[in-house]
Amino acid sequence: MLFHSLSGPEVHGVIDEMDRRQERGSGISSAIDRGDTETTMPSISSDRAALCAGCGGKISDRYYLLAVDKQWHMRCLKCCECKLNLESELTCFSKDGSIYCKEDYYRRFSVQRCARCHLGISESEMVMRARDLVYHLNCFTCTTCNKMLTTGDHFGMKDSLVYCRLHFEALLQGEYPPHFNHADVARAAAAAEQLRVQDWAQLGLTLGLPYYNGVGTVQKGRPRKRKSPGPGADLAAYNAALSCNENDAEHLDRDQPYPSSQKTKRMRTSFKHHQLRTMKSYFAINHNPDAKDLKQLAQKTGLTKRVLQVWFQNARAKFRRNLLRQENTGVDKTSDATLQTGTPSGPASELSNASLSPSSTPTTLTDLTSPTLPTVTSVLTSVPGNLEATSPTALHKRLLPTFSNDSPPPSPLSPHDFFKKEIIFS
């Protein structure tokens, strides 16, 4: 089939050429077998022999390696770090006259270095990126508890150090002193997670932080929303509870969730004016925000949920104290009005009837320094039994007459005189 398209003379010429080549090859092989030097290959002279760049010796082997424009024995081309024989490798790398394998070259001279171990990162290796830093997968761990962080985990960074969410929030709150042992922190965190766990379903994680409802007890699960104050609520109490000078910074204390070997000073957090305004505006609507509301407030104010929980806890306590104080003040005012304008069977009528009894001896007291003052007539009599429970100081404030601003009032009576005298106005 091969010679079918060729003419007769061309076929004979090809066959003759093939026969000549076979005869010449057989002659060379026979000459080599006989040891005839006239037909052997010329040997390399000693002056022109190549030198190995590894050992410096002459290369007399049939095969040798050429790398970095130099000749090498097959046994001499090795990595200077791990001594790996590069004879069967596809690539090798050179730096400052030294030969490296691929792994050692990227480890030592790679442009991308791990921010944790400061070693090189090869181009085929999987990495974790945080901001402008690159980490090995095994190096992307929490600095405190050495927990490996994977895709989807929440973490925080401070000074190029990586923290898990639990320890980063604790670091922001100043829970740990600088000399605190990492092993102790890990043990304390594990114990705290077993004792108190809060449901963070909307965040997709479990976080060991308690929820405080302002009373001092730990509330499990989602907190119950309290009713927001209606339009008829006491606005004066609310304003008194949230009264704060805008020029002053408001501070709050936090409890330490983890036990410490040494007593450390609590850190105090100062709020900015726009943060205070945002929190106060929301407090007027809802005194007890839930986790979703706290998340929205955290995004608006830039504060953590824990800080917001403590602030609302303190605001609720202050609001309740002011309500109790105003209720007590209202009760006192009501009792004063009852004593001054009492019913005929009340203490005031008994007091007036006793003062007008014939057995009393009237005496007149006048202020010599101010003749324009009204005359006060006192009657020596015994005080009824239902007035003995009233304190002398309170009775003095209720029964003394009012004086003009131009003249000073007379000197107050001693508490002992209130049990002997009764004051009436003429």
Curated annotation (Swiss-Prot):
Tell me, what's a Pfam family for it? LIM
**Localisation:** Nucleus
Q: Give the matching PROSITE patterns.
A: HOMEOBOX_1, HOMEOBOX_2, LIM_DOMAIN_1, LIM_DOMAIN_2
The record's subunit annotation is: Interacts (via LIM domains) with CITED2. Interacts with POU4F2.
- Official protein name in the record: LIM/homeobox protein Lhx2
InterPro entries found in the cross-reference section: HD (IPR001356), Homeobox_CS (IPR017970), Homeodomain-like_sf (IPR009057), LIM_Homeobox_TF (IPR050453), Znf_LIM (IPR001781)
Q: Which cellular components does GO assign to this protein?
A: nucleus
Q: Which organism is it from?
A: Rattus norvegicus (Rat)
Asked if the Swiss-Prot or TrEMBL record annotates the protein with the keyword Transcription regulation, the reply is yes
